[in-house]
Amino acid sequence: ADIIEAYRMATEAMRRREPCSIAYHGNIVDLLEYAEREKILIELLSDQTSCHAVYEGGYCPAGLTFEERTRLLHESPEQFRHLVDISLRRHFEVIKKLVARGTYFFDYGNSFMKAIYDAGVKEISYNGVDEKDGFIWPSYVEDIMGPQLFDYGYGPFRWVCLSGKHERSEEH
């Protein structure tokens, strides 16, 4: 779906109070900037890009196709890094505006807020200077799972077995 169609489908599903899954092929920054411009309320928002490897291709800068991103990543890593930083700053600014209008945003634990900080946005840190006190938005674990399950660094869930083979889960 394109941006307009994606939001139309989401709005219609919400009106009907029905679950809906929409595949949007594009950049999240463009999608969120459209929502902000059009005053579309996003109630719950997170980010699941691979920001633990933001400059190694885990984040595709707004304005580039995936193919352009891949070419630039290999041919001009410094230019790629520059475009990632610009896009991360735009990403932060639009999320900040959406949060001010009522969106609940949380970091999914993918180093998104750290990547924004590394892109030069000190405002994302609690103290506005460095990352030692954490960031302004909560992470999924600390804010959603943490209050009941993981406050003390441990909880009822220890291992995830992605193979689906029970014997693998017993190795740990």
Task: Show which residues each predicted segment covers.
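Glycine-rich phosphate/ribose-binding loops and adjacent secondary-structure elements
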Residues: 1-158, 165-167
